[in-house]
Amino acid sequence: MVFPIRILVLFALLAFPACVHGAIRKYTFNVVTKQVTRICSTKQIVTVNGKFPGPTIYANEDDTILVNVVNNVKYNVSIHWHGIRQLRTGWADGPAYITQCPIKPGHSYVYNFTVTGQRGTLWWHAHVLWLRATVHGAIVILPKLGLPYPFPKPHREEVIILGEWWKSDTETVVNEALKSGLAPNVSDAHVINGHPGFVPNCPSQGNFKLAVESGKTYMLRLINAALNEELFFKIAGHRFTVVEVDAVYVKPFNTDTILIAPGQTTTALVSAARPSGQYLIAAAPFQDSAVVAVDNRTATATVHYSGTLSATPTKTTSPPPQNATSVANTFVNSLRSLNSKTYPANVPITVDHDLLFTVGLGINRCHSCKAGNFSRVVAAINNITFKMPKTALLQAHYFNLTGIYTTDFPAKPRRVFDFTGKPPSNLATMKATKLYKLPYNSTVQVVLQDTGNVAPENHPIHLHGFNFFVVGLGTGNYNSKKDSNKFNLVDPVERNTVGVPSGGWAAIRFRADNPGVWFMHCHLEVHTTWGLKMAFLVENGKGPNQSIRPPPSDLPKC
């Protein structure tokens, strides 16, 4: 019983904080295959410790976490600790060929990092190939000793992980797509804590049940681990109070629908204030680009009030329509940093590096792509499709290796056009391994501009090594003179993954106070595969704690 054990561990941490403050937390992740049946189909999947989803990591703020990852499968493996700042410990960040070479079959690597200045819901996942479809789990960071939540303490906490499921092997799915030059097949189901819920013409194979008691409040730690789709999340007859996103507290607000993009986390309180019974939990996709294919199936689970007979009919709900842009915007526009004395919003007011990055698709020639009419769909930032190196970029930077990358990533698009209007006739991109160099402690603004090339689309952009403030969002083309005057520099939401709206833009700001090489990419796995990614190289500072630490002795070799 995975979740009761997690709850006991959580209670133990809360009950004995003096024993765990600044403690060392040790975990072993055995990466193994397991035969699993979902939607009346059985296949082998890659897992951690034979669990899907994988085990939850529990820690307090200031704890040091050591995870020994042992690779027992045929694939190369790496694990990313999504949202952990990794201050000066980039060797533990995890993206393959960016901060480390992957762990080869039969080998192991100990990820060693300290949780500094963070508390809340984060998650971990594989960061190579498409393995994160099944190799993922939660990270729960509890506040440090003597520091309560800035909201009423819930009766219980529950991790809820949303994902996708393919009947076919996911590596086969992506490899076939790359050979054809076309988009991969969409998933066959969405899942809630590993289960799709009701599936027509398929007998029930178990589903997730959230057990509650009338009159009590529960904290849901919600994670979108789906590969390619933003999701709406609802519970029939209940409303949420959102209190945190991406492990940063927000001004609480009430909603009946949560929007969560791949890579994002949302923590919300829900009160069991309805009449006893069973209530449907639903997760379904949001996609307001009419030409982009999605898996339109709804994953379901159940809220079960104590004392309710299992045969009691479940009260139902319907998620918003797939193209419910107004619902999505209402949720996103409600997010504000707490900006209190204890949790200030330290937004950079002045900017040293003002960057405009276009994010979108392109089409390159491909002589072997017969199914794609000898063309391949690609993705790019500022028209550069990122070329993955064969040596880890952080290693190349630290040891001054040459010929691996260049530091001339453009600050602005080299080709200016009506980004959200009619696409240019030439949709080809440049393929290169280019980084953008930042001096230590410099302030950065990045405007992420979607393009209509091939198709406008939402892009959940994730930045490793930093949190950032979302100071502005808009539709159409970004206008630096008009739109910057409307920026929120007082209490903008702080997070690590931002949803760039379809046919629009998002403006983020952060301080480059973490030396190393830090990946930035779309968290739609198909777009990352196609090349929508780049990296920042943050130089060492001059102070004693402003340089990246030496690499560990067991760092994997390429």
UniProtKB/Swiss-Prot annotation:
Database matches in InterPro entries: Cu-oxidase-like_N, Cu-oxidase_2nd, Cu-oxidase_C, Cu-oxidase_fam, Cu_oxidase_CS, Cu_oxidase_Cu_BS, Cupredoxin, CuRO_1_LCC
Signal peptide coordinates: 1-22
One Pfam family from the record: Cu-oxidase_3
Annotated binding of Cu cation 2, by residue: 82, 125, 523
Catalytic activity: 4 hydroquinone + O2 = 4 benzosemiquinone + 2 H2O
Positions annotated to bind Cu cation 4: 459, 522, 527
Cofactor: Cu cation
Class of this enzyme: oxidoreductase
Glycosylation sites recorded in the entry for this protein: 76, 112, 185, 296, 323, 373, 383, 400, 441, 545
Cofactor note: Binds 4 Cu cations per monomer.
Residue numbers binding Cu cation 3: 127, 464, 521
Main location: secreted
Superkingdom of the source species: Eukaryota
Start and end residues of each Plastocyanin-like domain: 30-146, 157-308, 408-542
Residues where Cu cation 1 binds: 80, 462
Enzyme Commission identifier(s): 1.10.3.2
Any one biological process term the GO annotation gives: lignin catabolic process
Assigned GO CC terms: apoplast; plant-type cell wall
A molecular function GO annotation: hydroquinone:oxygen oxidoreductase activity
Tissue: Ubiquitous, with lower levels in siliques.
Family statement drawn from the similarity comment of this UniProt entry: Belongs to the multicopper oxidase family.
Function: Lignin degradation and detoxification of lignin-derived products.
Designated name of the protein: Laccase-10
Lineage: Eukaryota, Viridiplantae, Streptophyta, Embryophyta, Tracheophyta
